[in-house]
């Protein structure tokens, strides 16, 4: 089968190759891939910033498809099902985290598209436990965004709980920020989305998605806008989705005393300067959130089924598998929102 592989560490080092199809084991499901979203992790792997623990490996982990084969022990999934899948492929099954189904925290976890061959391919293998059958109202294109949506669900509804009376600030109008804003808005909260001048098209898209206020922080005073909408208190919750240290430190003083700051974006450096004074003096709860877990997926699919998340406006380009490089170049250019590769 055709597959896009990271063949060795370093910049690019990616090729479209023909590799053998994997055999389905007893508890596994073979999926004919329909669409795969290009994730920031895929881009960082392309540029060599993300250090894979294993190469060569087929990339791709945000996918949808149709089941073509199931293992003999599989009982809940059948051939012909339209599905998406969690990225978790291997866990120890014994640690405290696995016993609570917090697979995202298992020290022995291996994920599809990073350590295990992923979905930038004609077919992908997943374990039955990770596979979710799509509701009838969710199409294969929308389903390819379930994984990043589940990450946003985990951040907003599991690591903390957004309430309808909350005033919420979100940094970063990229795919994650736009999904995060929609998840928060679906709870009835008031949402302010902050970006920079080059994000103008994304901020305009956010307005069309129902986001209450968008701010170009290079042209407008974010502090003034936040304090105006919150009667001077600051926001109840802040989701930092850009992975920019400047946004982190600009945001902390804008959180209400006793408010919550959720770090969704990943920083390029392990250690960064942090406005500790704001956290301490304002009694801010600073929360880290990593990936997603099974419960996140159930909620994400429900949101998609109820049409509370608009994926159509976010998917701005689709390229065939053979032209995967055009898709990556489109993401790197910064001119697209979400790019899918069609297998």
Where are these regions (language model features)?
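NAD(P)H dinucleotide-binding glycine-rich loop of Rossmann-like/cofactor-binding domains
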Residues: 91-171
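Glycine-rich beta-strand-centered segment in the early N-terminal region that forms part
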Residues: 22-36, 49-96, 135-137
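Residues in the short beta-alpha loop(s) of Rossmann-like NAD(P)-binding domains
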Residues: 195-199, 267, 292
């Amino acid at each position: 089968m055709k597959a896009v592989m990271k063949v060795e560490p370093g910049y690019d080092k990616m090729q479209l190759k023909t590799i053998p199809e994997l055999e389905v084991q007893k508890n596994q499901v073979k999926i004919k891939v329909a669409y795969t979203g290009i994730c920031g992790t895929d881009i960082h792997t392309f540029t060599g910033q993300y250090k894979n623990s294993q190469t060569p490996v087929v990339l791709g982990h945000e996918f949808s498809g149709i089941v073509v084969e199931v293992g003999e022990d599989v009982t809940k999934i059948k051939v012909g099902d339209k599905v998406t899948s969690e990225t978790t492929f291997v866990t120890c099954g014994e640690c405290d985290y696995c016993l609570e189904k917090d697979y995202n925290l298992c020290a022995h976890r291996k994920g599809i598209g990073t350590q295990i061959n992923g979905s930038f391919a004609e077919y992908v293998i997943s374990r039955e436990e990770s596979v979710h059958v799509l509701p009838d109202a969710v199409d294969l294109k929308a389903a390819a965004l379930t994984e990043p949506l589940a990450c946003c669900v985990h951040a907003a509804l599991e690591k903390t709980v957004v309430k309808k009376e909350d005033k919420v600030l979100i940094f970063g109008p990229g795919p994650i920020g736009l999904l995060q804003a929609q998840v928060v808005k679906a709870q009835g909260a008031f949402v302010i989305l902050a970006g920079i001048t080059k994000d103008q098209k994304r901020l305009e898209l956010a307005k069309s998605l129902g986001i209450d206020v968008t701010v170009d922080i290079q042209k407008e005073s974010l502090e003034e806008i936040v304090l105006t909408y919150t009667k001077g208190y600051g926001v109840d919750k802040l989701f930092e989705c850009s992975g920019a240290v400047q946004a982190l430190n600009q945001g902390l003083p804008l959180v209400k005393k006793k408010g919550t700051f959720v770090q969704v974006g990943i920083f390029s450096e392990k250690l960064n300067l942090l406005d500790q004074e704001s956290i301490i003096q304002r009694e801010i709860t600073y929360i880290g959130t990593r990936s997603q877990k099974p419960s996140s997926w159930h909620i994400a699919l429900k949101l998609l089924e109820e049409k509370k998340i608009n994926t159509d406006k976010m998917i701005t380009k689709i390229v065939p598998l053979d032209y995967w490089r055009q898709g990556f170049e489109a993401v790197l250019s910064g001119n697209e929102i979400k790019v899918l590769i069609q297998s």
